């Protein structure tokens, strides 16, 4: 057998698995499977499923229960620089987020390290570490509809975390936050537009939307670009089509009700809609508005 050989690992006819993910544990040489476990009918089991596998070996289930007795729904794994793995889990009926330390095999929770985001109803938990600082990202529980991505940061997983901060726009560019990953020298935020699941379906259906994230001393930002390129050397490269024709072009307020209001900001290139407060004196591509 090899890593590309298809075979059935296990069969659970009466179980639903959500948020399935795979991580390679270099210390054991095995791949760890993590998932949210629910019974086929209902949504009250709220268990975590952790197992490990090799190409020729049998599936070894480490955990198929509530972690340390706590209910668990949306979940993910975070691997620290020293190879220690942590389970991030939405708990207390999605009100809080628990952080558990896992054993060396990454298949069994052994310690509740912290409970964060208490009472905030955050989902799809994810942590990334940059320059010694931990950043926790999540979406708000909102069904299939967009929600505001928020983050918090800390110097220690078990220590005090900052208050939640907003990042991106208030709809995460018409999507829900899902994960954050390092690509080359850059970081990408993956969010999903669940258009096929909405009451009024969107033409494009379901698709991922990727934003570029930046970090600095506990603060984070992310920007949306319609087009991206991926480079083995540079990571994610934003592609901005078009040209800003009004850069450094003087502008004046032409609407009577806007007299005395500074108009400089209207040429910053950030607004793509017509303004009811400022009018161009000419529709020419260049020249003074």
Show where each model-derived region lies.
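Beta-rich carbohydrate-recognition and catalytic domains
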Residues: 1-19, 23-122, 129-134, 138-171, ...
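Signature of short aromatic-glycine-proline-rich micro-motifs recurring in repeat-based ectodomains
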Residues: 21, 178-180
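Small/flexible residues
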Residues: 25, 49, 181, 211, ...
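Short, solvent-exposed loop/turn motifs
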Residues: 186-187, 271
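Disordered, acidic Ser/Thr/Pro-rich linker "stalks" and the adjacent N-terminal cap
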Residues: 235-289
């Amino acid at each position: 057998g090899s890593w590309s050989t298809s075979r059935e690992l296990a069969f659970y006819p009466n179980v639903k698995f959500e948020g399935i993910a795979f991580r390679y544990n270099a210390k054991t040489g095995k791949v760890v499977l993590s998932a949210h476990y629910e019974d086929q009918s209902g949504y009250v089991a709220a268990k975590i499923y952790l197992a490990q596998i090799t190409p020729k070996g049998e599936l070894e289930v480490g955990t198929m229960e509530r972690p340390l007795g706590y209910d668990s729904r949306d979940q993910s794994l975070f691997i620290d620089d020293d190879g220690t793995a942590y389970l991030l889990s939405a708990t207390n009926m999605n009100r809080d987020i628990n952080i558990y330390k896992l054993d060396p095999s990454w298949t069994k929770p052994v310690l509740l390290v912290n409970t964060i985001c208490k009472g905030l109803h955050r989902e799809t938990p994810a942590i990334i570490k940059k320059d010694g600082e931990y950043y926790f990202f999540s979406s708000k529980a909102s069904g299939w509809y967009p929600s505001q991505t928020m983050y918090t940061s800390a110097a220690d997983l078990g220590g005090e975390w900052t208050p939640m901060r907003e990042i991106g726009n208030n709809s995460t560019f018409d999507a829900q936050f899902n994960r954050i990953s390092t690509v080359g020298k850059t970081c990408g935020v993956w969010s999903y537009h669940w258009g096929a699941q909405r009451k009024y379906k969107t033409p494009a259906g379901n698709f991922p939307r990727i934003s570029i994230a930046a970090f600095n001393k506990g603060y984070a930002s992310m920007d949306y670009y319609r087009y991206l390129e991926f480079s083995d050397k540079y990571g994610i490269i934003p592609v901005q089509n078009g040209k800003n024709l009004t850069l450094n072009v003087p502008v004046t307020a032409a609407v009577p009700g806007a007299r005395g209001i500074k108009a400089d900001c209207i040429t910053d290139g950030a607004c793509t809609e017509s303004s009811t407060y400022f009018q161009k004196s000419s529709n020419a591509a260049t020249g003074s508005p």
